[in-house]
């Protein structure tokens, strides 16, 4: 695989920087005036400390970028953009393919800091796994009064159809995406749990490939942990979950189709795992078993990694008009003849109101204090907390429990009196559907803005894979960046982008694999997207296309709810 073509003056990096003298004025053109705006004055900057010194993990990146002038910064940014376009990396919004902007400056996390995050994410996934097993089983946490029963019965993602479906190896959460932010003290906090079909891991892998091409020398001087083995961990988890044909189970990826926002990711993961990418019309059920139609005839399916929301999964159990799912799929799962990943009904674990009780779950199931704290949250369904929200509505961020993509959020300090009055009415009319949080100062990372670098808010979505024996956390995750000045909305649909996330390996590490740039560029599989039908060779029903666009639950979008 060839590397991205850069202008000749950019092809050498380290030696060139040492041999050529640069004036301080040139450095000022890149970092000059960095973080002088009051907008980010209270935020924790991940590259610079409060005295303006470069933090340890970023010293190499700073040394590479600081001597550059505006033309060099622009050249690298253009090379980066070309690479993304050439690789066909897009997301779908309202049926239109759009590029997903990748910023030039990676986000760097030290080995020790990542170790703490890894432990906290693993703890959280284990507690949520125990909670889901309990909720769809004996419901001891409800009988003991630890959380209120009406919290579950009022959750639209609690599905009684899932009762009695017991995962063969006890795993319901095969993949989790735990959204994190960093507060003004530099502490990571959990913003949200995504336990259904968390999206975005394809961009993690593609970001790495692209940055490795544009900054090959940086990978030679940094011990960056690899991300290209995600698909192998996911495949192991899926195969381990099989109840039938355990020695050689047939695994498929079930997609709503090309109109879905995350179709690029569905096809990429299927290719990397070496399994079939199927739509609902490719599968059928007979005698409580699931079969796939192939050119060689019927083939029994043992594990379905579905990227379809519960509501569209089985028209006999959920939406009767669904053309995306497979009739009889739920009964086949209940009979133990197929495993659906992630499990039906997992949404009762990532409801935004349920999120507020996760620390309580950890103490109940694990007898442990949370290693990663939640963001402080007021629950509008509780009378006293609802009144506090209404009293402080000008100072809070109001979030719909079922919101996604950043839509429906009301930022109290920025809202008009009319908007706040409308929000107050919604809260009074349906308090179960709203939570409120303080305006959080997200951390910032230098981001290309025109011909210079400026701070922009970021979040992080690490991905955890549970294979039944261990919870493995992909080193890094998807860093999303709010490209609009002052905005805290990182969603791609509202002007957000992403960054490559580097987790540095410890100096004496035997279990943490790292790659140099050459190996990264050569080893990552090609990821050109599957050809999209133009409408003539492959007829598509109109309801299917409409539902494929509609069936984009929060975890299927590259977005923060």
Curated annotation (Swiss-Prot):
Signal peptide from the UniProt entry: none
A Pfam family of the record is CP_ATPgrasp_1
Q: Which domain of life is it from?
A: Bacteria
Which residues fall in a coiled-coil region? none
Polar residues: bias regions:
1-11
Q: Identify the stretch(es) annotated as Disordered.
A: 1-22, 522-561
Q: Biased-composition ranges for Low complexity?
A: 541-561
The UniProt similarity line reads: To Synechocystis PCC 6803 sll0335 and to M.tuberculosis Rv2567.
What is the name of this protein?
Uncharacterized protein ML0605
Q: Which organism is it from?
A: Mycobacterium leprae (strain TN)
